[in-house]
Amino acid sequence: MSTTDRELRVGMVGYAFMGAAHSQAWRTVNRVFDLPARARMALICGRDTAKVADAAGRLGWDAHTTDWRELVASDDIDVVDVCTPGDSHAEIALAALAAGKHVLCEKPLANTISEARAMAAAAVTAQAAGVRSMCGFNYRRVPAVAMMRQLVADGRLGVIRHVRATYLQDWIVDPQFPLVWRLQRDRAGSGALGDIGAHIIDLTQYVTGRRITGVSAVTETFVKERPLPAGSSGLAATVDGATVDGLTAADANGADGHCPATGMVTVDDAAVFVARLDGGVLATYEASRFATGRKNALRVEINGSLGTVVFDLERLNELEFYDATRPAAEQGFSRILVTEGEHPYMSAWWPPGHIIGYEHSFTHQARDFIEAVATGVDPAPSFVDGLQVQLVLDAVTRSAELGSSWTEVEPALTTVAA
């Protein structure tokens, strides 16, 4: 429980899936962690007056607006939290930084390299004035992932040789699932690659401390045309009078059996690529929304000369660890239950053995952001880190377009400096 009187007034743009996740975090964080400042959920913004008013009451915000520029310009806002589709990230974040607001922006940082470069450069400039920014890769805040990184940093795996990462979902397997914004390049930037592939790109670079330097990729769009929704919000849509809600597909035909108008899918459904990381590390990545039966299956495995560590999101309170330095008769994968008070973040929660879930990663993200802003430290992942992921996404896209040709990934710091 926070004992400080300092207040950080948060304004959030967007109220759907990520907006709800972030709201839960802002609402909870000071009730769990003792921090040098308190978050106040001051203002939420959305395009639809009735829906944003409902979200404000349901999620716990003091007030609501339909004008994000009003939110950014307000003297009563200290932090701007961007939870919108990728096509508006740059405009909102750049305006917020220019107004002297601290910014938390959902991943991927932007839809294009040029937008991401501008955001990273603006964030670096704003640092001199004490304005902080963070890109929202929430899986870094899973305690088991943070411990995984510590095992690598402590040398428990020896020389890192091989990385393999997958993120698999199946929510658009049905060809009648509607053409929601996540399936349109102008709104989302890319498909499975940017939506979920960005997570495993960031996680592997974070855990190993090594940058992806080159890639060879293939991408595929399995269903190229889909029914047009009458409207959509977050992960829900209305098609010809029928609501398709959450991450499930449903028959999009109307009650009278006719087929609604259709539109073209302009993003990838799946992306697979091999990569090199600094130091010659070999890596493989797969991101797919067509892995039938896989609802939200993220898995990262790191192989080294002295051992292996594995994280599986479906068992997010655990790590698998293989220690090759143990006597041959004792070797084998062991399970580490990451619920001890000594484990990252866990001392604020429950007694050992009592597990946490997906939503806690957002609470931990809010904790780290508040602490960084209140103590004058630059939080991570920074917008430069977000740009580095964007550069990998761009290289993967270009490689796939060029028949899987080997494509180098430039360093983000060089890009920002340029």
List where the protein language model places each region.
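Glycine-centered short loops/turns at secondary-structure junctions
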Residues: 100, 130, 155, 280, ...
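Predominantly a Rossmann-like dinucleotide-binding segment in NAD(P)-dependent oxidoreductases
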Residues: 129-131, 139-265, 319, 403
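Conserved SAM-binding strand-loop segment of SAM-dependent methyltransferases
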Residues: 62-67
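Glycine-rich phosphate/pyrophosphate-binding beta-alpha loops
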Residues: 198, 286-295, 354
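Beta-strand-loop-alpha-helix segment that lines the small-molecule cofactor/substrate pocket
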Residues: 79, 85-140, 155
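C-terminal helix-rich "cap/oligomerization" subdomain common to oxidoreductases
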Residues: 1-4, 29, 79-81, 124, ...
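C-terminal glycine/acidic-rich active-site capping loop/insertion
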Residues: 224-268, 272, 276-279, 306-380, ...
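N-terminal Rossmann-like dinucleotide-binding module
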Residues: 1-59
